[in-house]
Amino acid sequence: MKTVTVKDLVIGAGAPKIIVSLMAKDIARVKSEALAYREADFDILEWRVDHFADLSNVESVMAAAKILRETMPEKPLLFTFRSAKEGGEQAISTEAYIALNRAAIDSGLVDMIDLELFTGDDQVKETVAYAHAHDVKVVMSNHDFHKTPEAEEIIARLRKMQSFDADIPKIALMPQSTSDVLTLLAATLEMQEQYADRPIITMSMAKTGVISRLVGEVFGSAATFGAVKKASAPGQISVNDLRTVLTILHQA
C-alpha cells in the first residue's frame, strides 16, 4: 500500500498516527490553545475552522493559520471546516466552503485540507486537483452522527473517495449497537485488504465505538483522533492514554 508523507510523518506505516483537533473561536484563543497543544504528544494538528467566529474575514482566518504554523512548525497542519450537516458548528454555502478551502491552499500555510465527499462531485474533483497542484494533501471525509450503514455502503463511500484521488479517505460513523462497531471494523478490514491503495481512516464514535479508535493497526485504519482538552467528537480519549495503547498494540 502507498503511504502518505507529510513533513517527516509517514501515514500508513507503523502505529496509527494521532490527530488532535484545535477548536477556538478567535485569534487570541487560537494563540493560547496552540501554546497549550504544543506540549502534547500527537502527530497531526487539525484546525477545526468551523469553530472560528470571524469566518467571513479571510485575512483573519489566515492570520490564525499563520499562528498555528509558527507555533508548531514541525507538525502537519490539517485545515478542516466541518459542515453543520456533518456535525460541524456552522453552516455555509458550498461556494463559500470551496472558496475557504482554496484560500487555505493558496496560503501555503496548511499541509492538508479536509474535503467532505458529499460536497458535490464536480466541486470535490476540482478542489482535489487544485490542492494537489499546490502540494497540499486531501483527507476526504464522511461523517454520520446518527447511524452506521451496511459494510457494503461504507466500502462504497471509501472507494468513491479513492476514485476521486483523495490522499486519505476517512469515514466516521455512529453506532447504534456493538454490532455496528463490528460492521465498521469489518468494512475497514475488507477495504484495506481488497481495495485500498492508500491509507484510510475509519472510526466508530461514542463510548460504544472507542475500541475502533485503538485497533487501527489491526484492522487497517492509519490514524485516530485523541483529545488534548475538549473532545471534538464523542468517544475520543486523551492523547496520553491513546499513545500508550497504540504503542502496546504496535509492539505486541
UniProtKB/Swiss-Prot annotation:
GO terms for molecular function: 3-dehydroquinate dehydratase activity. CDD domains: DHQase_I. The keyword Amino-acid biosynthesis applies. It catalyses: 3-dehydroquinate = 3-dehydroshikimate + H2O. One of its GO terms (biological process) is aromatic amino acid family biosynthetic process. It is an enzyme of class 4 (lyase). 3-dehydroquinate binds at residues 21, 46-48, 82, 213, 232, 236. The active site is at 143 (proton donor/acceptor), 170 (schiff-base intermediate with substrate). Keywords: Amino-acid biosynthesis, Aromatic amino acid biosynthesis, Lyase, Schiff base. Pfam families: DHquinase_I (PF01487). Its EC number is 4.2.1.10. It comes from the Bacteria. InterPro entries: 3-dehydroquinate_DH_AS, Aldolase_TIM, DHquinase_I, Type-I_3-dehydroquinase. The keyword Lyase applies. Pathway: Metabolic intermediate biosynthesis; chorismate biosynthesis; chorismate from D-erythrose 4-phosphate and phosphoenolpyruvate: step 3/7. Involved in the third step of the chorismate pathway, which leads to the biosynthesis of aromatic amino acids. Catalyzes the cis-dehydration of 3-dehydroquinate (DHQ) and introduces the first double bond of the aromatic ring to yield 3-dehydroshikimate. Belongs to the type-I 3-dehydroquinase family. Homodimer. This is 3-dehydroquinate dehydratase. The lineage of its organism: Bacteria, Pseudomonadati, Pseudomonadota, Gammaproteobacteria, Enterobacterales.
